[in-house]
Amino acid sequence: MQISCLPISIPSITPRTSIPLLPSLSSNPRRIFNLTSLQSPNHCFFKRLHKSQTGFSNPVLAAMRREEDVEVDDSFYMRKCVELAKRAIGCTSPNPMVGCVIVKDGDIVGQGFHPKAGQPHAEVFALRDAGELAENATAYVSLEPCNHYGRTPPCTEALIKAKVRRVVIGMVDPNPIVFSSGISRLKDAGIDVTVSVEEELCKKMNEGFIHRMLTGKPFLALRYSMSVNGCLLDKIGQGASDSGGYYSKLLQEYDAIILSSSLSDELSSISSQEAINVSIQPIQIIVASNAQQSHILASSHTVEESGPKVVVFTAKESVAESGISSSGVETVVLEKINLDSILDYCYNRGLCSVLLDLRGNVKDLEVLLRDGFEQKLLQKVIIEVLPEWSTKDERQIASMKWLESKHVKDLQSKQLGGSVLLEGYF
């Protein structure tokens, strides 16, 4: 049952915590308005804030409703966990991004996220933040707490020691070392456990980590730009590589990017501009078609300590040597250049996600692209449609005669300035 009411004035009500009247509720977790404090026999519908509202309209409290048999705010707090986890985007591989909040009497008393591999997990930071207030509180965490000793102690034991009353989990950990054992340990300790709250949101955030755990391969996405008549374009849209642009965010999100050797002079400019991750850039993977090209690529670029790392792949017949050149560029020699071997290299380096960027000389990457489709190694496609009509027939996607029809699932689109961005899954 849903009961709605007209906006009402609330100047005479003194809440337990300050009310942020204009900003979004998510702007400051310690200032979340606790509606429970307004409960009275005459106003029982104040139990739950309608989550379609982004905040409060000053000076009135907007649409309220009561929902039967729904626990207050589980989804809201799990979305907060996801927001926290994404603060470490691009920094955690081979670990997942995880966020945690501790809630007591309707207030967030602690929060944390996993910043990078080897550092404490989200639950530890959140429990430290909450201190003694964690006792009898509810812990929300986007991924099942670990139950083993690795580089850090088990998070299950930290939650048990803190005497939390309840744990709400976004998704079960696909890591076979953890899988459901964390849930079992918490239940055995007498803690109430709820699983699969905002599960799809939590899964999407860590699709690279999940794919790596289930398949032993990094998550691989294909990106390209095209004209409105279906020709590949050797550029990205205006502002796409600037801070906040979709391409800059992609470079922040993915652990490695495969590029055409024709872009070798532009490598220093192919980097994420996102402020929170400006010093951590994806590994740039270049495929050299011959020994001369391999030598030029390895010797002509100096890798800065804080800049993108460059790895050149070359075939054995090119008579190159594996190793790192004086300029800091790594050379990897393979029996034969193929996508599967490159992905194995990325997996062994602890990478969760790889972006195949179809720019520059597409012929450089056609073998890898064909491998991706024929061996079903591609999971996602990202297409930027630019407002242009091209007359270059040789760059028509249809010219790739080996390419078979593919069904794209969960296709989404959004307009970015004059371009349209399409994203979907194979």
Swiss-Prot record:
GO annotation, cellular component aspect: chloroplast; chloroplast stroma
EC code(s) of this entry: 3.5.4.26
Record's keyword terms, sorted: Chloroplast, Hydrolase, Metal-binding, Plastid, Transit peptide, Zinc
Every CMP/dCMP-type deaminase domain range: 72-194
Cofactor descriptive note: Binds 1 zinc ion.
Main location: plastid
Cofactor: Zn(2+)
A GO biological process held by the record: riboflavin biosynthetic process
Transit peptide: 1-61
CDD domains referenced in this protein's UniProt entry, alphabetically: Riboflavin_deaminase-reductase
Active site: 123
Location relative to the cell: Plastid, Chloroplast
InterPro entries: APOBEC/CMP_deaminase_Zn-bd, CMP_dCMP_dom, Cytidine_deaminase-like, DHFR-like_dom_sf, Eubact_RibD
Pathway: Cofactor biosynthesis; riboflavin biosynthesis; 5-amino-6-(D-ribitylamino)uracil from GTP: step 2/4
One GO molecular-function entry: diaminohydroxyphosphoribosylaminopyrimidine deaminase activity
Binding locations of Zn(2+): 121, 146, 155
Regions crossing the membrane: none
Reactions mediated catalytically: 2,5-diamino-6-hydroxy-4-(5-phosphoribosylamino)-pyrimidine + H2O + H(+) = 5-amino-6-(5-phospho-D-ribosylamino)uracil + NH4(+)
Function, as annotated: Monofunctional pyrimidine deaminase involved in the riboflavin biosynthesis pathway. Also has a reductase domain that lacks catalytically essential substrate-binding residues.
Further details from the record: Unlike bacteria that have a bifunctional, two-domain RibD enzyme, plants have a monofunctional reductase and a monofunctional deaminase, each having an enzymatically inactive domain.
Entry domain remark: The N-terminal domain (64-250) is required for the deaminase activity.
PANTHER family reported for this sequence: CYTOSINE DEAMINASE FAMILY MEMBER (PTHR11079), RIBOFLAVIN BIOSYNTHESIS PROTEIN PYRD, CHLOROPLASTIC (PTHR11079:SF162)
UniProt protein name: Riboflavin biosynthesis protein PYRD, chloroplastic
Gene expressing this chain: PYRD
